[in-house]
């Protein structure tokens, strides 16, 4: 008899119902739960899957380059980045009528195309690519890398090439290689590319493989490096009249500390970026030689952690036993990695718009909005995942004996204090912020807007002033010409930085007022509530006063039967599930704030945000309703336009979102009864009853239906906002 899906679980494979399929899919990547799994095979499978993941990423990026080279307008765009719309790829759709063909034929293309809002054109332009041939070469190289990683993944599954568990658990060696190799060497290589290829290209000098060895990136070559005159590399930078991509106004410096932005491109100086990467490379190359491996020199992480005992003995045994706990738990390691990656992704969102690194990207408003929103949503999902795996660690990998009285045990012991403090912070923020918003709404509704409670964010304004913003009149630190910090930095990076901070055309240190104060606290409410749900889920994952034996039921369980009331919805998975709703809510507020603030800034109408953002009706009417007008009337009997597809996606997003509630509100019994009725009808319908199934159809489990509901809710929510964001921004600014 042929083996049935899933091969990794004989118990599931023999299940006579459709549960076999859904549970099979749900546990396909839960390698720990598979039949015949060993620790060694677990590590090897994950290792091999990493190569597959990298292969997919390289294939995807190769596809981006290939399609732009084939169907885009990169070479035309390069000649006029501010006025030509970058094309992502062509569209072929049999449903398009003449109005659609005309609407989507733009950017100088012969037929319908999609416009790129990803910023890749600006990135490729900044790093020195100029022709379609450059793009094709890049695509082929990445395709080669993709194939290489697939072969490497397969190779490491061969018996002779499988690494041992001890190799995987050699934390010091892995850290050294990742710090030095992954971050250090790659940053150094990137500095090399910027200095040898991107910088000359920005100054009108074309460097490729043919002349790579003949063109000196700096007139004196490596002389200043070996002569100890490093400052020479920063002398004669590009002037403020430099035209990017030409020799007009260009300098010869390669590593600078100018601060601020290139006046024409409105992006960071390329020489500053090269300098930054060189510094990063140096730091990580040193960091990658810190840990003790075969040579008996350097730090032992275990020794550091064991020695890290708090003074006075008040806080227990500190970090004792942490090394083994972390090193033997993949979920702990994944939780730490996801937490770090989540924070970094959110930082990318914040820095890409405030300190744009790519030439002309700051003037492409739709791209700026799309990139900010994209990275904040990604960050939200990654951060919630960190807590999910933290909870799984507590259930599957945590050993109370091994961690007696250390920092982990003490976190669990005083979890009530942690959770109740978070709860208090959430309630405080929620009631006060909502109270202020609602008060202001009532005042406007009753015709007395002067009675609004408007609080100036003076502490935040003071911090902005300390960084050099003079608008508020605080004579402090860099905002004061007499301050020692101001005097010390005057000859270095300060002139460029101060010019940028006080320029109203960019997004660096935006001017803030009462509307910002309120929405800041609304976002703080969202962050604290999301954190409360996630932290509670992880700290209560092993057990609570209500259910002391919770860990025995695993990560996701619906309830412990009817005889034990109140055990529904309290699994660690349920906490994750609830937190995702709050995370989406929070990211929604963050992106609403960012987008509204910026479209009023870009339109030269900052007063609209300042006046309307202090009460809820202002947000609903002057941000959401006003900017969705083109989407609500997106296509009609009289024709269509370039926004029609976004109007349709706006509608479709709402539909997907609403479908989620069907799974979230009605439970298993309803669906089981419905399925049985449909099966009865199917078996009695001519022709239809020729089709049979081997598995008896049964309803999804409670946990699975929640997941399906959550996925629909999330996808619909994001689709709806993505369509709104792109249409409302591109409709205004093109």
Swiss-Prot record:
Phylloquinone binds at residue 671. It is found in: Plastid, Chloroplast thylakoid membrane. P700 is a chlorophyll a/chlorophyll a' dimer, A0 is one or more chlorophyll a, A1 is one or both phylloquinones and FX is a shared 4Fe-4S iron-sulfur center. It holds the Pfam family PsaA_PsaB. Its main location: plastid. PANTHER family: OUTER MEMBRANE PROTEIN, OMPA-RELATED, PHOTOSYSTEM I P700 CHLOROPHYLL A APOPROTEIN A1-RELATED. HAMAP family: PSI_PsaB (MF_00482). This is Photosystem I P700 chlorophyll a apoprotein A2. It comes from Gnetum parvifolium. The gene is psaB.
């Amino acid at each position: 008899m042929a083996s049935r899906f899933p091969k990794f679980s004989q118990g599931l494979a023999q299940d006579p119902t459709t549960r076999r399929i859904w549970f099979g899919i749900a546990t396909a990547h839960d390698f720990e739960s598979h039949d015949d799994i060993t620790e060694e095979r677990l590590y090897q499978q994950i290792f091999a899957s990493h190569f597959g993941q990298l292969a997919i990423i390289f294939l995807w990026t190769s596809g981006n380059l290939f399609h732009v080279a084939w169907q885009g307008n990169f070479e035309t765009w390069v000649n006029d980045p501010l006025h030509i719309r970058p094309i992502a790829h062509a569209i072929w759709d049999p449903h398009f009528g003449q109005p659609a063909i005309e609407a989507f034929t733009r950017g100088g293309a012969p037929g319908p195309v999609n416009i790129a809002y990803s910023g890749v054109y600006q990135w490729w332009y900044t790093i020195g690519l100029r022709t379609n041939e450059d793009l094709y070469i890049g695509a082929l190289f990445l395709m080669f890398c993709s194939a290489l990683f697939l072969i490497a993944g397969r190779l490491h599954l061969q018996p002779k090439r499988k690494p041992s568990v001890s190799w995987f658990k050699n934390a010091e060696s892995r850290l050294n290689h990742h710090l030095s190799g992954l971050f250090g060497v790659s940053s150094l290589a990137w500095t090399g590319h910027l200095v040898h290829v991107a910088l000359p290209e920005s100054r009108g000098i074309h460097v490729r493989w043919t002349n790579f060895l003949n063109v000196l990136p700096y007139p004196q070559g490596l002389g200043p490096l070996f002569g100890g005159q490093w400052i020479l590399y920063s002398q004669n930078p590009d002037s403020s009249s430099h035209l990017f991509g030409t020799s007009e106004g260009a300098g010869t410096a390669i590593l600078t500390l100018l601060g601020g932005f290139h006046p024409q491109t409105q992006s960071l100086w390329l020489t500053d970026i090269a300098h930054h990467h060189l510094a990063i490379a140096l730091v990580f190359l040193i960091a990658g030689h810190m840990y003790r491996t075969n040579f008996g020199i350097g730090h032992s992480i275990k020794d550091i952690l064991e020695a890290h005992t708090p003074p006075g003995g008040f806080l227990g045994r500190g970090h004792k036993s942490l090394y083994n706990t972390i090193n033997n738990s993949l979920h702990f390691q994944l939780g730490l990695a996801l937490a770090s990656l989540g924070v970094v992704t959110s930082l990318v969102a914040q820095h890409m718009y405030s300190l744009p690194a790519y030439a002309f990207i700051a003037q492409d408003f739709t791209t700026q909005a799309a990139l900010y929103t994209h990275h904040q949503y990604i960050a939200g999902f990654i951060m919630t995942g960190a807590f999910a795996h933290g909870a799984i660690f507590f259930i599957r990998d945590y050993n109370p004996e091994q961690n007696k009285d250390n920092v982990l045990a003490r976190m669990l012991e005083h979890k009530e204090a942690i959770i109740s403090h978070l709860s208090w912070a959430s309630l405080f923020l929620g009631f006060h912020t909502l109270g202020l918003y609602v008060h202001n709404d009532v005042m406007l509704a009753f015709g007395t807007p002067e009675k609004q409670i408007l609080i100036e964010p003076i502490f935040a304004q003071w911090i902005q002033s300390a960084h050099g913003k003079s608008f508020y009149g605080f004579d402090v630190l860099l905002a004061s010409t007499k301050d020692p910090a101001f005097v010390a930095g005057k000859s270095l990076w300060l002139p460029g930085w101060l010019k940028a901070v006080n320029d109203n055309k960019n997004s660096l240190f935006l001017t803030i007022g009462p509307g910002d104060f309120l929405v800041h606290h609304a976002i703080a409410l969202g962050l604290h509530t999301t954190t409360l749900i996630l932290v509670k889920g992880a700290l209560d994952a092993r057990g609570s006063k209500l259910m002391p034996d919770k860990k025995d039921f695993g990560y996701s369980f619906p309830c412990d039967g009817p005889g034990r009331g109140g055990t529904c919805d309290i699994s660690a998975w349920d906490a994750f599930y609830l937190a995702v709703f709050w995370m989406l809510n929070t990211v929604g507020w963050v992106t609403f704030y960012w987008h509204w603030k910026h479209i009023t800034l870009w339109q030269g109408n900052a007063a609209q945000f300042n006046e309307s953002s202090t009460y809820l009706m202002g947000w609903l009417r002057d941000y959401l309703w006003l900017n969705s007008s083109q989407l609500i009337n997106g296509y009609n009997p009289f024709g269509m336009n370039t926004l029609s597809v976004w109007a349709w996606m706006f509608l479709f997003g709402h539909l997907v979102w609403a479908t989620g509630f069907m799974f979230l509100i009605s439970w298993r019994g309803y669906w089981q009864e419905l399925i049985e009725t449909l099966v009865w009808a199917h078996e009695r319908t001519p022709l239809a009853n020729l089709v049979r199934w081997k598995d008896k159809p049964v309803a999804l489990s409670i946990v699975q239906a929640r997941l399906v509901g959550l996925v629909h809710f999330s996808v619909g929510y994001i689709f709806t906002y993505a369509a709104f964001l792109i249409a409302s921004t591109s409709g205004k600014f093109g």
